[in-house]
Amino acid sequence: MAADGDLRERIAGAEHDQGNWQDPNLAALVAEAGAAAKALAGEAARGLKARLSVGGRVSGRALDGAQEATHGLAWLATYAESLVQLGDWAARLTREDRFGEIERLVLSIGAGEYCAQILGGIPMN
């Protein structure tokens, strides 16, 4: 897995390269992004747990006061798993020789949007 800075640079570069959806390594890049996002979500969960723990246990009162943070963590974990599943989907279709232009565009748009939001801010409602 690439270091966070390296992955951030690759994702940011991909956002500016309109032809990147044709990259034959797109599925691998999405799988890498999914792994990095899952690692980030794991770090965020550990950090939040440490912040909310009192005496080695998560405090209900602290949890009540951190609803925005826990909601954000849930969204981050959801986006991370979505990237993993998108990467798996693309790999499966590639093995079956069914990964065409439409699938590549779906992958590029979906993964690109999730990566952009992970890096720039996840909108919550």
Located regions from the model:
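Flavin-dependent oxidoreductase catalytic core characteristic
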Residues: 1-125
